[in-house]
Amino acid sequence: MVTIRADEISNIIRERIEQYNREVKIVNTGTVLQVGDGIARIHGLDEVMAGELVEFEEGTIGIALNLESNNVGVVLMGDGLLIQEGSSVKATGRIAQIPVSEAYLGRVVNALAKPIDGRGEISASEFRLIESAAPGIISRRSVYEPLQTGLIAIDSMIPIGRGQRELIIGDRQTGKTAVATDTILNQQGQNVICVYVAIGQKASSVAQVVTTLQERGAMEYTIVVAETADSPATLQYLAPYTGASLAEYFMYRERHTLIIYDDLSKQAQAYRQMSLLLRRPPGREAYPGDVFYLHSRLLERAAKLSSSLGEGSMTALPIVETQSGDVSAYIPTNVISITDGQIFLSADLFNSGIRPAINVGISVSRVGSAAQIKAMKQVAGKLKLELAQFAELEAFAQFASDLDKATQNQLARGQRLRELLKQSQSAPLTVEEQIMTIYTGTNGYLDSLEVGQVRKFLVELRTYLKTNKPQFQEIISSTKTFTEEAEALLKEAIQEQMKRFILQEQA
C-alpha cells in the first residue's frame, strides 16, 4: 500500500501556486452574422474603434467602418470566401498602418505596402498610419519653388510649385496619365521622390507605366502603389492614403516628393460601393454624404513645410475622369474646389492632333508665377496673351470672309505658337529649352516658316544651341534670369540655324 505523504503534496501545491500567473487577457471578440459582397456584419466587438482593424478566424483582415447599436459593419481586405456565418472575429486594437523606408524606392506595392513585383520582401523598421493628420497652418509656408513638368504648356502658363495640388481633369483617353508620367520622367536629377498611385486600372496599363519608368531610369526615385480593377473595393479606397503615407515619410525627412493619384474617380466609386453595401444613406449621384471629406483629407496632406520642419514638400497631382467633358458633375466639382488649380485636357484638341491636349483657356494655376523662375516669367507672359487673342480671333475668323493683313498675321502667329506647344510623349524639355522655344515663337522668328516645319526647326535649334552655345544654358541655370547676354546668344543661334534650315529645305 502506497503511503500518502502530506508534506510532498503540500510542496507540490505551493510550487504550483508560485508558478500560477494571474495575468488576465481581455480579448474583444464578436460573431459573424452575415458576410458577402466584401462586407461582414458582426455581433459583439463592443469596444471596437471606428477604423480599427479586425481579424477573422481564417486570417482575413477587415476595417470596422459602421458602428451601429446592435452590430458592426466591417469592410474586408480580401475576398472573404472562407469566412463563415457564426465564426469568431477579434479586434486587434490597431488602426491601419504601413511600414515605411527608403527601401521602397523602385518597388511596386499594393495598398497594404506589400511588394507585388516579385522581387522579395522590403525591409522597414518604421511604421506610419495610413490616415494621418495633415500639417497645420503654422507647419506650412507658401509655395515658392517650381516643380517642372517638362511640358511647355504647363510650365509656362499653368505653373506648378512644390507643395501645390494641381488637378489633371479630362475625358478618358485624353492623355491624363501621359502628363503625369512625363512629370515623373522630368524629375530625374531634381532630387524629387515620386509616388504613382494606380487605382482601379487595368493591370496592363499599370505594367505599361512601370515599363516606361524602368526604361527611362525613373524607377530609381519612384514608388508605384497599385490596386487594379479586380482588387476589392476596400483596397482601392485605401491605396491613395497608402501612397500619401509613403510620400509623407520622405517629406518629413526634408525631401521633396511628388504624388500622382490615378485616378480619384475610381476611388470615389469604390467608396460609394462600400457605403451602399453598408447601407449608408446615398446622396447626390448615389455617393455618400462624406465623399467630399474622402478627398479633402487626402489632398490636404500635400504641403510645403515651414523652415522649422525642414522645408520638405509634397506636391499632389490628382487625376479625375469626366464623362463627355462635364466638369460640373459631383466628383469633378468637389476636387476642383479642394485643389489649387486644374489642367483641363480636351478630347476635341486631342483628336485634332494637339498633344498634350491642354485647354489653356480654362486651365488655371492658383499659385501662378510664384512657382516660376524669373527667366520663365520674362518670356511666358507674352505667350499666354497671344494665345488667348488667337483663340478669340480664330472663333471670329470662321464667320468672317475677308480679314485685314494684321488679323491674318496674328492668326498665322497663333498657329505657330500652338504648334510649338505640341510635344511627343515621354519627351520632357528642360527649362532652358522651354525658354528658348517660347522666345523663338513669341518674337516672330517662326512666322517665315510653314506650320508643318515649326517642330522640325525647333528640334534642330535645340540641338544647335546645346552644341554651339552651351553658355546660354549655363547663364539661365546659374542666374535663373533671361539676361541680355543670354538673349544675344539666343538671337545669334536662331539666325544662324534659320540660315542653315532654309538652305537644307531648298536643297
UniProtKB/Swiss-Prot annotation:
List the subcellular locations: Plastid, Chloroplast thylakoid membrane
Protein EC = 7.1.2.2
Q: How does it sit in the membrane?
A: Peripheral membrane protein
- Molecular function as annotated in GO: ADP binding; ATP binding; proton-transporting ATP synthase activity, rotational mechanism
Could you name the domain of life of the organism this protein comes from?
Eukaryota
Bilayer-spanning residue ranges = none
The reaction(s) this protein catalyses: ATP + H2O + 4 H(+)(in) = ADP + phosphate + 5 H(+)(out)
Entry-linked InterPro entries: ATP_synth_asu-like_sf, ATP_synth_asu_C, ATP_synth_asu_C_sf, ATP_synth_F1_a_nt-bd_dom, ATP_synth_F1_asu, ATPase_a/bsu_AS, ATPase_F1/V1/A1_a/bsu_N, ATPase_F1/V1/A1_a/bsu_N_sf
Which residues of this protein are annotated with the site description Required for activity?
S363
Binding locations of ATP: G170, D171, R172, Q173, T174, G175, K176, T177
Sorted alphabetically, the keyword list is:
ATP synthesis, ATP-binding, CF(1), Chloroplast, Hydrogen ion transport, Ion transport, Membrane, Nucleotide-binding, Plastid, Thylakoid, Translocase, Transport
GO CC entries: chloroplast thylakoid membrane; proton-transporting ATP synthase complex
Q: What does this protein do?
A: Produces ATP from ADP in the presence of a proton gradient across the membrane. The alpha chain is a regulatory subunit.
- Note the subunit structure: F-type ATPases have 2 components, CF(1) - the catalytic core - and CF(0) - the membrane proton channel. CF(1) has five subunits: alpha(3), beta(3), gamma(1), delta(1), epsilon(1). CF(0) has four main subunits: a, b, b' and c.
Task: Family membership, please give it.
Answer: Belongs to the ATPase alpha/beta chains family.
Write down what this protein is called. ATP synthase subunit alpha, chloroplastic
